[in-house]
Amino acid sequence: MNVPTVAITGVPDPLPEGLTVLDVREPVEWAHGHIDGAMHIPMMELPDRLDEIPDGQLLVVCKVGSRSAQVTSYLLQHGRDAVNLDGGMLEWAQAGLPVV
């Protein structure tokens, strides 16, 4: 399955209403900075917490885009509208976009 992926240059600023950013990094990574308003569910917890994720479009992020690609594939298999952020939080930070 091809995983839908968006480059940092393709992410609208500000993020559109109705888009949920799903951060699948570990808690220690999340604590070092994350996208304001993002939902945090570590990758390994996702199967047990799938029902917590709202309907609508999802932008899935991790540190570099590998874990988020796996999660995006999983979400698509479960009927969700998900896109992986290529380059993850490293690209987000390098683009000078805000983190909290």
Language-model features, listed with the residues they occupy:
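Rhodanese-like catalytic fold shared by cysteine-dependent sulfurtransferases
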Residues: 1-20, 26-58, 66-100
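Short, surface-exposed ligand- or partner-binding patches at beta-edge/loop junctions that are enriched
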Residues: 61
